[in-house]
Structure formats: C-alpha cells, structure tokens
Amino acid sequence: MAFPLPRGITPPEISFLAEMELVTIVPRQRLEGLELLGGPVAPLIPPRRTNVPLWLALLLKRQRRANILPPPWLHPESLSLILDIETRDQAYQHAFSPPPPLPGQPSLRERSYKKSTARPRFTPEGTKYYATPPFLPQNVAQDQAFDAFESEPPTLPFHWLEVGTMLLDAAADDLVDPDQTRRLLKELREVRSAKIRSGVEVLDDAAGPGGGVALTGVGAMEIGEGRGFISGVVDGLRRIGASKEQARREQLADATNREYDDMQDYNDEMEF
C-alpha cells in the first residue's frame, strides 16, 4: 500500500532548489567556462572571484579545486545583529526580521519615503519577467560588507537555512568561526520557529472573517516545515468553526420558532 504524497513541496526538494543559489568562489585551478541551464559560467582563473551555483561550488570544494567565500549575512557579527532584531526589537516581537529588497525595490532605510516597485528583467527574446530566489544574488560575497552595516542592517535571504547548513557541512573551514555561526543559526531557527507556532494562535479567527498570519521574511525551509502543521491547524479550526456556525444557526432557528409560537398563542388569546 502506497502512502499518499505530502501536500506542497518537501524539505529535500527545497534543499535541491537552494543549490541553485549563486555563491562566490576563489578557484585554485583553471577551468573552462560551462554552459548551464541557469546561464553560462565564466572560465575559472585563480585567484579571480567568480559567482557560480551552490551545487557547483560544493562540488569544486569537495574536489579541493576552489574555496567558497561566505555571504555577508553568514558572519557571526551579522547573525548576532539579526538575532538581536528578532528578540530585542519591539517592532519584531511578533514578526520576522525584514527580508532583503528585490531588484528595483528601495532598501530598508528608504522604504519610508520611496515607493516599493519591483524592476523587471527581460529574456533574450524580449519577454518580461521578475526574478525571484534562487535567481537573485542574495548569497554572493561583497567587498567591505561590514562597512555597509552602518547604513543598511543585514538581512536573511529566502534560502538562508539551507545555504547556511550546506556551507557549514561542506565548507566549514572557509567560514569565520564556524562553531559560533552554527550556534547562532540554531538560535535563529528556534526563535523564528517559536514565532510561527505562536502566530498560529491567531488562526482561530480563520473560522470567522479576517484571520491570517503574516509570513513576510519567512524562509523557504521554514515555510516547508510549517506547512503541514499550519494546514492541520487551519483544517481543525475550520471544522470547529463549521460546527459552531451550525450550532449558532440551530439556536437562531429555535429562537425564531419560539417567537413564532408565542406570537401565535397571543393571537389565539386575542381571538378568544
């Protein structure tokens, strides 16, 4: 007997999609350019930095043919700042730290006075499209990244949990203080998971009008892991709400019948 397929995308499938994220490497050996489905990869010439898909970077790292430069957010200082936002900032006690802006959107500090509009891209045939993760450079290394913290706080990309876990497993020697990085990632995951669980409490309004949970800033793996739990809660609340609505309608019908009977008795007495 075959088990039913899980609803939605599974965690292994999410990790597979995260391997398409672009990361920065420093090649140790020369390698000719590659033509991939996601686009061409420039020839690898040491020590020139190159952005390649994560799966290719992990392959070259295992073969000791390249080193991976961690993205700015995967630094202990960046993760500590994000953890402070998640736990100490009153504006985010029941919300998640803001995600990085999409192409064409203003930065976090500019959103108060600039209109948020995404900038489209175009295919070679001229078709317009809007790029989304994993096809955005949210995990590439940047020069002078920490100087930018003074003007722009660090943010977690959409595939932060998957990318961080894979880099810690395969390229821990390329990260700054991997033990502390692993601990901060674990704390962030626990804090954000607790927010998701606590946010489900407001889903009791799903039985009535206007219920919902804001998921702005939630990562792909967090959505995949919480989908089954949240869906089960919503289904249960919907059934409870349906039974409550049925009971309310029955009470309303009984009250209407009693009023009709009382009025009928009154009319009978008046006729008598």
From Swiss-Prot:
<feature type="region of interest" description="Disordered">
    <location>
        <begin position="244"/>
        <end position="272"/>
    </location>
</feature>
<protein>
    <recommendedName>
        <fullName>DNA replication complex GINS protein psf2</fullName>
    </recommendedName>
</protein>
<dbReference type="GO" id="GO:0006260">
    <property type="term" value="P:DNA replication"/>
</dbReference>
<dbReference type="Pfam" id="PF05916">
    <property type="entry name" value="Sld5"/>
</dbReference>
<feature type="compositionally biased region" description="Basic and acidic residues">
    <location>
        <begin position="245"/>
        <end position="261"/>
    </location>
</feature>
<dbReference type="GO" id="GO:0007059">
    <property type="term" value="P:chromosome segregation"/>
</dbReference>
<comment type="function">
    <text>The GINS complex plays an essential role in the initiation of DNA replication. Has a role in chromosome segregation.</text>
</comment>
<feature type="compositionally biased region" description="Acidic residues">
    <location>
        <begin position="262"/>
        <end position="272"/>
    </location>
</feature>
<dbReference type="InterPro" id="IPR007257">
    <property type="entry name" value="GINS_Psf2"/>
</dbReference>
<keyword id="KW-0159">Chromosome partition</keyword>
<dbReference type="Pfam" id="PF25005">
    <property type="entry name" value="PSF2_N"/>
</dbReference>
<dbReference type="InterPro" id="IPR021151">
    <property type="entry name" value="GINS_A"/>
</dbReference>
<dbReference type="GO" id="GO:0000727">
    <property type="term" value="P:double-strand break repair via break-induced replication"/>
</dbReference>
<feature type="region of interest" description="Disordered">
    <location>
        <begin position="93"/>
        <end position="128"/>
    </location>
</feature>
<keyword id="KW-0235">DNA replication</keyword>
<dbReference type="InterPro" id="IPR056784">
    <property type="entry name" value="PSF2_N"/>
</dbReference>
<keyword id="KW-0539">Nucleus</keyword>
<comment type="subunit">
    <text>Component of the GINS complex which is a heterotetramer of sld5, psf1, psf2 and psf3.</text>
</comment>
<dbReference type="GO" id="GO:0000811">
    <property type="term" value="C:GINS complex"/>
</dbReference>
<dbReference type="InterPro" id="IPR036224">
    <property type="entry name" value="GINS_bundle-like_dom_sf"/>
</dbReference>
<comment type="similarity">
    <text>Belongs to the GINS2/PSF2 family.</text>
</comment>
